[in-house]
Amino acid sequence: MLISNTYNQHFPQLTQEQLARNATKKVICGMSGGVDSSVSAFILQQQGYQVEGLFMKNWEEDDDTDYCTAAADLADAQAVCDKLGIKLHKINFAAEYWDNVFEHFLTEYKAGRTPNPDILCNKEIKFKAFLEYAAEDLGADYIATGHYVRRAGDNENAKLLRGLDANKDQSYFLYTLSHKQVGQSLFPVGEIEKPIVRAIAEDLGLITAKKKDSTGICFIGERKFKDFLARYLPAQPGNIRTVDDEIIGRHDGLMYHTLGQRKGLGIGGLKNAGDEAWYVVDKDVENNELIVAQGHDHPRLFSKGLIASQLHWVDREPIRESLRCTVKTRYRQQDIPCVIEPIDDETIRVIFDEPQSAVTPGQSAVFYLGEVCLGGGIIAERI
């Protein structure tokens, strides 16, 4: 039996009754080959559950590229499962990923918006395809993942809470989940901080203990985003126009730029322009023009609110009256105090207490009441 003193210091000892109850439940833990899922599987074992792992392959890498680390990740996941003494199942969801995540990603970029495929992957793959496969084919009572979020309550009353580690909280990426999906999921590392996760992995001598966290979009990996996009979407160069209606340069394609972007515009050193940096303040998709302004505090960078659509509320109840809460318009952002005003069941108006910069159509706005993630939607337009 593997022992971790760090685990014993940070988790309460369960009663025999709790252990016996958990022993009747089968949990399929998504194993990514990273430290978070590795430690999640161990925690579940310590809590008495019947634990098995599942490695998902969601992307078919090209033979001539070495960006996708699927083979190495699978080897690490297998090594961890062998060490923990649990079975590892393998499943290929690449077709589902292409149809339900990647094609949407390309469509949004083509339309000049900036989508977040990781949110869609959680919605369509990890908490839909994986959840269904685990329940129907593997007989799971629960699935588990290494996400830094917490769950409160069961079944119809399940709520999604921020992870205990504020630096790692991933509730922003899981706002599309329903209370039913949350109720069928366990998030073992959501109750602890990242350094403790690594310490537990060190105690156990897991191969993933020092493995660096994966960054960026899963199917792009460490490669250059611009090079990757160019393989699927032909770039359409166009003019860079100032807010004063002056053309001052050319862009390679609107899809390569985001609101608030400062670097990589190639428009420095203009005569009579002063020293202040240029920022992207808008995209004119119709005319294929990038709109820029000087200064990090230019009014065009700021929005007093937003319109959001494609709404998902965790409790699946539409908001019918004004609600004061907080919102994040991008990951790792400080909470923004705001008021939600319903327009209809599918659309809301959000007014910030203070104007905010770089609110980006296509990204997600995610709402909170204290620790509870209420849900969110896609930013349709800035106000």
UniProtKB/Swiss-Prot annotation:
Region annotation (Interaction with target base in tRNA) ranges: 116-118
- UniProt KW keywords: ATP-binding, Cytoplasm, Disulfide bond, Nucleotide-binding, RNA-binding, Transferase, tRNA processing, tRNA-binding
* Chain positions covered by the region annotation Interaction with tRNA: 168-170, 330-331
Q: Which GO terms describe its molecular function?
A: ATP binding; tRNA binding; tRNA-uridine 2-sulfurtransferase activity
Q: Which reaction does it catalyse?
A: S-sulfanyl-L-cysteinyl-[protein] + uridine(34) in tRNA + AH2 + ATP = 2-thiouridine(34) in tRNA + L-cysteinyl-[protein] + A + AMP + diphosphate + H(+)
Report residues binding ATP: G30, M31, S32, G33, G34, V35, D36, S37, M56, G146
- Where along the sequence does the record put site: Interaction with tRNA? H147, Q363
Annotated InterPro entries: MnmA-like (IPR004506), MnmA-like_C (IPR046885), MnmA-like_central (IPR046884), MnmA-like_central_sf (IPR023382), Rossmann-like_a/b/a_fold (IPR014729)
Tell me where it resides.
Answer: Cytoplasm
Give the EC number(s) listed in the UniProt record: 2.8.1.13
Q: What SUPFAM superfamilies does the entry give? A: Adenine nucleotide alpha hydrolases-like
| Keyword tRNA-binding attributed | yes
Tell me the active site. C121, C218
Q: Name one GO biological process term.
A: tRNA wobble position uridine thiolation
- Protein function: Catalyzes the 2-thiolation of uridine at the wobble position (U34) of tRNA, leading to the formation of s(2)U34.
The similarity comment for this entry is: Belongs to the MnmA/TRMU family.
Q: What is this protein called?
A: tRNA-specific 2-thiouridylase MnmA
The organism is Haemophilus influenzae (strain 86-028NP)
Q: Which gene encodes it?
A: mnmA
